[in-house]
Amino acid sequence: QRPPYNELMNFLFIADPLESFKIYKDTTFSMMREAQKRGHQVVACEMTDVRWQQGEAVSARVRKIHLTGEQTPWFTETGKHRAALKDFDAVVMRTDPPFDSEYFYATHLLGQAEREGAKVFNSPAALRNHPEKLAIMEFPQFIAPTLVTRSEDDIRAFHAMHGDIILKPLDGMGGMGIFKVGADGLNLGAIIETLNQGGRQTVMVQKFLPGIAQGDKRVLLIGGKPVPFCLARIPQGGEVRGNLAAGGKGVAQPISARDREIAEALGPILAARGLMLVGLDIIGDSLTEINVTSPTCFQEITKQTGFDVAKAFIDALEARLAA
């Protein structure tokens, strides 16, 4: 019997190495801090620590940690042991993309843990079924003109039709590998060659959205409901990419009526599939990506607006566990 959510809980965060956290902006850190503030035990591991062996439950070599409240060291380790994932009240999967074969295998290990009784967020099957770039195909009414193909001819025809286009690989993150080609088609051949690798790699091509000048908006869904503020990531200098990792500037702002319309249409559907935390990327009025692996921007929104996103997330997690 799981405790009602006014009782203290054990949360396992599967994350990137703790030593690499940039705590001034890290979303997983803000989740851990909020959980600890409520008296919950924070435990961490990396995907490399997780194993399944016949006759045993899926388990991990975990680190019990205490957040110090300081910049460095930001945590102290209070113990290390092997524990079954099903013995935690919640397992929060926070490993960054890329969604490569290792990530795919991780979702299967976590799926096995789920069958054994572990409560994993986001749901491993849902992580697998929602590749960040391709998940938008399910909601064509909200997206810009888009093409997904391996064919150079298709890409050239799409360019001839739309003029200004953006080309992106399906497995990039943080704006990696994203190219803009103008109506003149300058460099289109070289870019197709780079991304498409002679027809071996699938490419996504979209009509260029001039709204990017006002920012690539990250709209967060928690338990299917939109956070009232988004983070507009505004390209700097000569960039067409707003991603913070590509030097974009993050400006928090209230979500627009269109942002809310998209969020309220997708929210309940995605939440019902076990996606407790989702980051929608919206440029102008168009949905461009659905991020499910490790959505970020909690700290930026909270610092600029006072809306405590980590609190909203842990509230939703506690409520879900009590349900």
Residue ranges and their predicted role:
Residues E19-V148:
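Conserved N-proximal alpha/beta basic substrate-recognition cap immediately N-terminal to
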Residues V42, V120, I165-I166, L277:
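Hydrophobic beta-strand scaffold residues
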Residues M9, I14-A15, F21-Y24, G238, ...:
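ATP-dependent carboxylate activation and anion-phosphoryl transfer catalytic cores
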Residues F13, V92-M93, Q206:
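Redox-cofactor binding/interface segments in oxidoreductases and associated redox assembly factors
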Residues Q1-L8:
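Short, Lys/Arg-enriched N-terminal segments with co-localized hydrophobic residues
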Residues T28, E152-D153, A160-D164, D171-I262, ...:
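Phosphate-binding site of ATP-dependent enzymes
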Residues Q36, E114, H159-A160, A271:
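Anion (oxyanion) recognition and catalysis
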